[in-house]
A protein has these predicted regions:
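Glycine-rich Rossmann NAD(P)(H)-binding loop
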Residues: 48, 319-327, 356-361, 387-395, ...
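Mid/C-terminal beta-alpha module of Rossmann-like enzyme folds, strongest
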Residues: 373-445, 488
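A hydrophobic C-terminal alpha-helical subdomain
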Residues: 353-357, 420-469
């Protein structure tokens, strides 16, 4: 990281020396990471050139020094003094609500129950406004719309120039679908300049729209809450207002992470022996919402439900773990930013697996199947308004290891203590420290990986509905896992 990144700030700062052992160690560590000779306790990590990659290195090396902190802590407390005060003091205030605050939504959630004998009629979506069309899910929803519907698809693209918006959309469609839609751009596929952060969305927003599918969001899990609130929460509020204005149906894409069953900031804080269930009738069940991404998506859902109580026709679809296409295993171009994939790479290349995780499972929701499910729900759902679109064909880790063994990958199941010792050793070598970095936010204070949760996500209602309308998830079997692994080997990401 270049020293010049924060040179101006360095020249103007007043150096404040560290006073404690922890402050001294962290200041020295930051100096090494930022390539700055002398870092004081009041110096802001980001003002002096720090970024997300540097923050990951900061957290990993701090762990190696015995200082436990999370990536989100670095964003919340960017100076050494504020970070040490937090780490040595009381926990920061948690995001809390009262369950009674959500009683007003009961009439909406009561619609999402199985009613034997109920039938659903397919309805045309008409012309569609699609936000997030250049994203992983958005692009595949566009593909489904082109295959299953006949109306125009207006794609909201952030850009200041007409040529840029066309080029950006054309580039992503070519990446996923080759030349299939080249001749349709500016015909059925209409890119329009706009931004969900802008009230009104766009100066050229169409009014001949019957359905809005809102997939645009920032899906990073760490950063400032003001940013996530602006994009995910207020951005959704702007989409809702536009839907109300033109009388369009809204399909809002959310995430199952709002359940609290997620690898958030400091997982050990959230563990509980009290088992809770989160289904299509749930919103707030006392789950942790301190992760900035999850909190912003939770609040975005509230904006949609509030509008529904005022008469808006809307559906909220909470999606699961989006993975490679079923058809050919294609994945998103920015694959290195995918947290699940980062962990898969780390565990396969590490070659060790802790015995205490053998009874857990992983969920793979192929992106093309997920997009198909979104359109099925949009076409057939009537009064029902919340869906959990995640695969029920999970794969247990013991079966996953059997499959990767057959693919020639050596994996050894070891005790938790042995796994932890070996994991700590990875910090000492620059070519293996990425392994520790992949898991650093998933460990409790004893260094144990925590992937279980007291919150159980259920999707019985959605599975019943999807079966009624002719949709079923694929098996997560040898064929799919083999294709998944081979894809990342071919592009050079997996080196096993």
């Amino acid at each position: 990281m270049a020293q010049s990144a924060g040179l101006a700030a360095l020249q103007e700062r007043e150096y404040v020396a560290p006073a404690t052992e922890m402050e001294t160690n962290l200041c020295k560590l930051l100096g090494e990471i930022l390539h700055i000779e002398k870092v004081g306790v009041e110096d802001d990590f980001f003002e002096y050139g720090g970024d997300s990659l540097g923050a990951i290195e900061y957290v990993a090396k701090a762990h190696g020094m015995g200082i436990e902190m999370s990536l989100q802590n670095v964003f919340d407390y960017p100076t050494v003094r504020s970070l040490c005060d937090f780490l040595q003091g009381e926990d920061k205030e948690k995001v809390q609500y009262k369950e009674t605050d959500f009683d007003k939504y009961k009439e909406l959630f009561d619609r999402n129950v199985i009613k034997e004998g109920e039938k659903f009629e397919k309805k045309s979506l008409g012309n569609v406004l699609l936000t997030g069309a250049t994203g992983f899910l958005g692009a595949h929803i566009l593909n489904e719309l082109m295959q299953k519907e006949t109306g125009k698809i207006y794609c909201l693209v952030r850009s200041n120039k007409v040529d840029d918006r066309r080029g950006r959309l054309r580039e992503i469609l070519k990446y996923y679908f080759g030349d299939r839609y080249e001749s349709e751009i500016n015909k059925r596929i209409v890119p329009i300049i706009g931004d969900i952060e802008q009230k009104g969305l766009s100066d050229e927003i169409p009014t001949d729209v019957q359905t809005i599918i809102h997939t645009a969001a920032s899906v990073k899990h760490y950063g400032s809450y003001s940013y996530f609130n602006r994009v995910n929460t207020e951005g959704t509020a702007h989409v809702v207002e536009y839907a109300k204005k033109i009388g369009a149906k809204l399909i809002h894409i959310s995430t199952l992470s709002v359940s609290g069953n997620s690898m958030a900031d400091d997982f050990s804080v959230y563990r509980s022996d009290e088992e809770k269930f989160f289904d299509e009738t749930s919103l707030y069940i006392g789950q942790p919402l301190d992760n900035v991404y999850i909190h912003s998506k939770f609040e975005a859902e509230r904006r949609v439900y509030d509008a529904m109580l005022e008469g808006l026709d809307a559906k909220v679809i909470r999606v699961g773990n989006l993975t490679n296409r079923l058809s050919d295993y294609k994945f998103q171009p920015n694959y290195t930013s995918n947290a699940f994939l980062t962990r898969v790479k780390a565990i396969l290349e590490f070659g060790l697996f802790p015995d205490y995780l053998m009874n857990l499972y992983a969920e793979f929701s192929p992106i093309d199947k997920t997009a198909e499910g979104v359109i099925k729900i949009a076409q057939y759902a009537d009064k029902q308004c919340v869906f959990h679109l995640n695969s029920d064909k999970v794969i247990y880790f013991n079966r996953f290891l059997e499959i990767v063994h057959k693919l020639g990958i050596s994996m050894y199941v070891v005790s938790g203590a042995e796994f932890n010792r070996a994991l700590q050793e990875t910090i000492k070598q620059s070519n293996t420290e990425y392994i520790f970095e992949a898991f650093q936010n998933d460990m409790d204070k004893q260094g144990k990986l925590v992937y279980d949760s007291n919150i159980r996500i259920k999707n019985d209602f959605t599975l019943w509905f999807l079966e009624k309308v002719g949709f079923e998830w694929n098996e997560t079997d040898m064929e799919y896992i083999s294709g998944y692994v081979d894809y990342f080997r071919k592009i050079g990401y997996l080196e096993v």
